Amino acid sequence: MAVDIQPACLGLYCGKTLLFKNGSTEIYGECGVCPRGQRTNAQKYCQPCTESPELYDWLYLGFMAMLPLVLHWFFIEWYSGKKSSSALFQHITALFECSMAAIITLLVSDPVGVLYIRSCRVLMLSDWYTMLYNPSPDYVTTVHCTHEAVYPLYTIVFIYYAFCLVLMMLLRPLLVKKIACGLGKSDRFKSIYAALYFFPILTVLQAVGGGLLYYAFPYIILVLSLVTLAVYMSASEIENCYDLLVRKKRLIVLFSHWLLHAYGIISISRVDKLEQDLPLLALVPTPALFYLFTAKFTEPSRILSEGANGH
């Protein structure tokens, strides 16, 4: 195969784009930014992203997809109150919105029309922040080579959040207006108003910290799920197994946290160590059991009552 010989490209992410190919002859352009859907290889040539996402990539996308859903459920529960019977319908609607947004996002991504995406493999943290690695050969002129080296893991999250927001604005107000009769006019839409705040926050979080989240999300899941489970059981004054079994809602919350524990463990293990670390899944119920066995020594109900009385 004949390839035109040109000087090597500067910078980590500058590459040469294929201009012409005729049989075994390939002609590449000057060093610059790679087109969307391509990234540089070791020889500094822009190559299309043709690989399938790894299991860890899918788990990361699943984590980013869960964030708005969990926040929806939290604010729905927060603003619905104990007297409202509309919370369940709103929970189901939020799940439907996020599920449909995920399906639509996959369908509009390359290749279009199938529930499959092609991607470039993440090699290091700097792949998420190519804008920080634009070379300046003479320390005056900057060669701009910013592109999505982790295609499409960075932008697909923004697309998903956009569809989540659109579907929420189309479906949720009609549902809330029709069934949330137990709430006041000023309260029934507060969960929607909350989403209008946390979606921009999630967008900025992905834009600035997407690479950090990619490597840290398994540990974030484990820590947050442990903390929130302890806080929930303490606030609900659960001190023994009977308190846990007396209400179905508490069991649902417990099993949801167990699923998050398992999700975090599998994410940390990755696919290359999954078989070795599968026995760790047996530890999923351990935090809840530890809490139940030690609750009698801390007496969460007494602590809550003293806090409410200002002591």
Curated annotation (Swiss-Prot):
GO terms for cellular component: endoplasmic reticulum membrane. It comes from the Eukaryota. The chain crosses the membrane at residues 58-78, 88-108, 150-170, 189-209, 211-231, 251-271, 278-298. It is found in: Endoplasmic reticulum membrane. Glycans are attached at N22. Interacts with RNF5 and MAPK8, but not with MAPK9. Binding to MAPK8 occurs before and after exposure to stress, such as UV irradiation. After exposure to stress, interacts with phosphorylated MAPK8. Competes with DUSP10 for MAPK8 binding. Associates with multiple components of the proteasome and with ERAD regulatory proteins including AMFR/GP78, CANX, PSMC1, PSMC2, PSMC3/TBP1, PSMC5, PSMC6, PSMD8, SEC61-ALPHA and UFD1. Interacts with DERL1 (in the presence of misfolded protein CFTR(F508del)). Regulates the duration of MAPK8 activity in response to various stress stimuli. Facilitates degradation of misfolded endoplasmic reticulum (ER) proteins through the recruitment of components of the proteasome and endoplasmic reticulum-associated degradation (ERAD) system. This is JNK1/MAPK8-associated membrane protein.
